[in-house]
Amino acid sequence: MISRGFTQSGGRPHAEALALGSIPDHGKPNSAAGMTMYVTLEPCAHESERGPACSHLVAEAKPDRVVVGQLDPDPRTNGQGIERLRKAGIEVVLLEDDASRKSLCGFLTRETLGRPYVTLKLATSLDGQIAMADGTSRWITGDRARAHVHAQRARQDAILVGGGTWRADKPRLDVRLPGLEERSPDRVLLSRGVAPDGVRVINEPAQINALEGVQTLYLEGGAEAAASFLAQDLVDEIHLYRAPIVIGCGRSALGDIGLEALGDAHGRWALAETRQLGSDAFTSYVRTR
């Protein structure tokens, strides 16, 4: 590896500009000759007050080959960046693979749907309960599962709970893994009440569109908040942590999601990952339609 770069906070400089700026003879024509460049997202084709189009910089540096993970859905680029590179005589390989799509899920969802990528986290007993009938829920899952949740939190821009969960559990909603404490996401409350200090509030799920700076959102409950997001088709991925216990008469993981026919529930989710976390099972599902 000769150099690497990643897009900086605020959107500029872009990853390509930083990577090219670190190679020998950077800024000169053909400075990347003989090299292969790998990018998760298609180099942009539009100029900006904060920097030139990345596809122009790459075309000028002229690596032999550019491997692109995903097309940029931004209409100012969408295929035009790749076209510019090919016109410059650069071989371009477009992967459109699952790994790069996953790494860009927040950006792609913002660009195409105008909202964050939403992951719903559920921690349940074998019979789908998230608490005892009296509300006791600490702890259903074990230490390894809870540590895994904190690792997922560290990957998110924001974390959301409903007002009922906030009042009942007073959750910290932070990351408590050594070395990752500074990666705690912004906290968001779904409520019609006043937001506590340091917490953003939305009154209904659709208002996630207006959460500035949030491309990925982790939804941690409770049952009514989770159901409201599912009912409005705002969940892209489900993380299910299941403990080997049976509660019986407890509190269900979900409220009413407005499902009218069983057939409508099928074919909507696909298994993405499964693993064992101590005595608990973790499975993730991604939306297929």
Kindly give the residue locations of the regions a language model identified.
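Hydrophobic "anchor" residues
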Residues: 1-2, 46, 130, 137
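Short acidic/polar alpha-helix capping motifs at helix-coil junctions
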Residues: 45-49, 111-114, 194-197
